[in-house]
Each structure stands twice: as structure tokens, then as C-alpha cells.
A protein has these predicted regions:
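Short N-terminal alpha-helical targeting/association segments
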Residues: 1-2, 11, 19
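Non-heme Fe(II) oxygenase metal-center motifs and adjacent flexible, charged/small-residue loops
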Residues: 20, 24, 35-238
Length: 238
């Protein structure tokens, strides 16, 4: 078990510009996002919170005082791990720290290992209930990824494992430093970068995982930690 370093100060930054490729239909704008086409054409648009494509981005969803409280609680009270994955016959540690909380009936295969729910600690239930209420989803599992600085990352993937009930949305809560979450359309290859800052909530609707891949690239200038909590509805196992 590898534990995360505890930092007393989490650096925060928020990008406010938005560039959009005209071929996309935006419902009400996209907060702090860049959408790029293969030709590199960009358009500027207003910085507003709202639904774009197959996800909804709500900046500053969590109150400022609550952000610091939940960041500190999660970093200090969760047992962090840095699992290994086998790539081309060699074992490598994933470039981030991870943890998993869930109902006891839940099992989830992630990063080459099966994670089994052991129930929810009392201290975490208020946040679970808050996110579930906002998302109108009965979340029964949460995956934690702690990016210690801008060197930690996540490759292209979709949260489409068979254990996940794809009829419900996935809620992603960001705490700590800002990072760009990249989306890539599975068919067209179009890209969209969404800047997620401290306290932001991203709701990915059921079609998002089917239509888009996403990942978190390296950002060498980021020196502080970012914590991402993704709440999901899992199919229970006997």
C-alpha cells in the first residue's frame, strides 16, 4: 500500500476562456472548455455553466469551505493504493493513487484488479447523499483518483465496464488544482477539452461513454494535487 503525501495547501487555478468548433451544437454554452477540430479551427464563446454534448459541467458546484473540508478528509482518511498494470509483458505502477468505496454487494474490475465494496464510512455519507441527490441517481460506488501533481495522468478510456449500470449518469467531482479533462469522439475523432477546477461537478449522461473516450493528460506546470471522485451505479453481485 502506497500512501499519498499530505499537503496543507492545495493550489487552485481556473481557466476562463472557451473556444468552440462551429460544427458542434452547444445547448447553453460550455464552461472553460476548448473544442478543437482536425483542422485546428477554433471559435470563442462566453464562459457559462451548462450542458454541452453528452455531459453537463457545473463550475463551483461545491461551496468553497466544503471543498477544503472534503479534500482534507479524503486525502487523510482513505487508504490510497498505487496498483500495477501489465503493459507489453512488463509491470508498471499507474501514474496516480487510487481507492474505491462501495456497497458490500459491489465488485469492480479496475487497473487489473477486482475491487470489492466494504460499505461506506460514516464520514463520507453526507457527500455521497449530496451528489446522488444532485444527479438523481442511486450511486452505490465511488472511484477515487488522486493526481499528486501535473505528472500524474490518466490515458484514453471510457467508463463502460460491464459492472457499471449504463442506464444512469456518472458524476465526477473535482477537488484541488485545475486540470483539463479531454474528450475524443469515437467516430469523428473531434476533441473537447474541459477545464475542471476546485469544486466543479461534471455529469456524464449514459450516452457519453458510448460516444466519447476521455483522459487526463500530463500538465507539467501543475505542482499541486487534484482529487477526482467518480460516482457510479454498479450492478450488485450476490
Amino acid at each position: 500500500m502506497i500512501l499519498a503525501p499530505i499537503s496543507a495547501i492545495y493550489g487552485l487555478c481556473r481557466a476562463t476562456s472557451l473556444t468552440l468548433l462551429s460544427v458542434f451544437t452547444l445547448h447553453q454554452g460550455c464552461a472553460s472548455a476548448r473544442v478543437l477540430g482536425r483542422d485546428g479551427v477554433q471559435r470563442m464563446a462566453a464562459n457559462e455553466a451548462v450542458e454541452v454534448m453528452n455531459w453537463t459541467h457545473q463550475p463551483a458546484w461545491l461551496a468553497p469551505d466544503d471543498r477544503e473540508i472534503w479534500m482534507d478528509r479524503c486525502v487523510q482518511q482513505i487508504n490510497w493504493d498505487q496498483p500495477q498494470v501489465r503493459v507489453y509483458g512488463r509491470w508498471h505502477r499507474v501514474p496516480r493513487l487510487t481507492a474505491f468505496l462501495a456497497d458490500q454487494q459491489v465488485a469492480y474490475r479496475y487497473s487489473g484488479a477486482v475491487h470489492r465494496g466494504e460499505g461506506w464510512p460514516d464520514w463520507f455519507r453526507p457527500l455521497l447523499d449530496l451528489v446522488s441527490s444532485r444527479s438523481s441517481a442511486p450511486f452505490n460506488g465511488c472511484l477515487f483518483n488522486l493526481y499528486r501533481d501535473g505528472q500524474d495522468r490518466m490515458g484514453w478510456h471510457a467508463d463502460d465496464e460491464p459492472e457499471i449500470d449504463a442506464s444512469f449518469p456518472i458524476a465526477s467531482l473535482s477537488l484541488g488544482s485545475s486540470r483539463d479533462l479531454q474528450f475524443r469522439h469515437r467516430v469523428s475523432g473531434a476533441r473537447c477539452d474541459v477545464s475542471l477546477a476546485d469544486g466543479d461537478l461534471l455529469l456524464m449522461d449514459p450516452d457519453c461513454q458510448r460516444l466519447w473516450m476521455h483522459g487526463l493528460p500530463v500538465r507539467k506546470r501543475v505542482k499541486q494535487a487534484r482529487l477526482n471522485l467518480t460516482f457510479r451505479v454498479f450492478r450488485s453481485v450476490d
